[in-house]
A protein has these predicted regions:
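Active-site helical microenvironments for divalent-metal-assisted chemistry
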Residues: 1-120
Length: 120
């Protein structure tokens, strides 16, 4: 029997393989590394919609890939919740993924803070 985690990993590999035709190997590698970080980081976390956080992040990334967004935007989408789960997220993302991905995640985080503030 295949576990949900094994099935999820296989689905991610299949999706990444499909991306290889649209991106250079280094770009696909950046997206793959984002998935590798997000997998354990988001494990067991649930979105407000009730969906697993990783599933939500990958679904959003898949939509953006279909819109021909760049690899850094796709990686940032996958890592959008990192500030909630990593104390040193800014330094880590900049070191591992570059300044652009870090800035995009920071922007997503700020938009979420604004959304939460507006609900008060």
């Amino acid at each position: 029997m295949v576990s949900n985690q094994q099935q999820s990993s296989e689905n991610i590999r299949t999706w990444l393989d499909a991306l290889a035709s649209a991106f250079a190997p280094a770009e696909t590698g950046l997206i793959r590394r984002a998935c590798e970080l997000a997998g354990p980081l988001y494990e067991g976390q649930i979105e407000l919609t009730g969906a697993p956080l990783l599933q939500h992040a990958l679904g959003a990334a898949e939509i953006l890939a279909g819109m021909h967004m760049d690899h850094e935007t796709i990686a940032a989408t996958i890592l959008h919740a990192a500030p909630e789960y990593l104390d040193d997220w800014a330094e880590r993302l900049e070191k591992d993924f570059g300044a652009q991905v870090k800035m995009l995640v920071e922007g997503i985080s700020r938009m979420e803070q604004i959304r939460q503030f507006s609900e008060i």
